[in-house]
Swiss-Prot record:
Protein name as annotated: DNA dC->dU-editing enzyme APOBEC-3H
Active site: 56
Family named by the database record: Belongs to the cytidine and deoxycytidylate deaminase family.
InterPro entries reported in the protein's UniProt record: APOBEC/CMP_deaminase_Zn-bd (IPR016192), APOBEC_Cyt_Deaminase (IPR050610), CMP_dCMP_dom (IPR002125), Cytidine_deaminase-like (IPR016193)
GO cellular component: cytoplasm; nucleus; P-body
Biological processes per GO annotation: cytidine to uridine editing; defense response to virus; DNA cytosine deamination; negative regulation of single stranded viral RNA replication via double stranded DNA intermediate
Organism of provenance: Felis catus (Cat)
Amino acid sequence: MNPLQEVIFCRQFGNQHRVPKPYYRRKTYLCYQLKLPEGTLIHKDCLRNKKKRHAEMCFIDKIKALTRDTSQRFEIICYITWSPCPFCAEELVAFVKDNPHLSLRIFASRLYVHWRWKYQQGLRHLHASGIPVAVMSLPEFEDCWRNFVDHQDRSFQPWPNLDQYSKSIKRRLGKILTPLNDLRNDFRNLKLE
């Protein structure tokens, strides 16, 4: 695995609402750890989008090749810069469903196009299918830094307002994952008559 450069990590995994100057394009990076249930690391890697192929699809291909032994259980932790798009969410759900010996957890730095219904549905589908999607906070950023960044033995230095941004994104994700029935009941409970 080629570790990420510090500047790439901070730019791409940064959870700020707006890109700080100098402006740059945010890309999708997916860093994962494949472990045995007792914690033994089998493999780790960092992937990114390739031409017309999302990082999640590259991830599925890699994991398929690494987990052919269906008698062995595997746990996978993913750190991703953007939450999966609806297509990738669907593919991840199908992949985990077809491979019950795998357990997948996703930590996203930011939510991708979270205001669009289709993207929200993708996140809900992951959640409903038993694939937890959570927002990265300081412990996840630190773990990602330790395991995937060429940090030259430097500790992770959080950018300003990292915690505040994480909490804001978590609230948004929580609202997306709240079942619509609960929202309807909450609306009825307002008794706006």
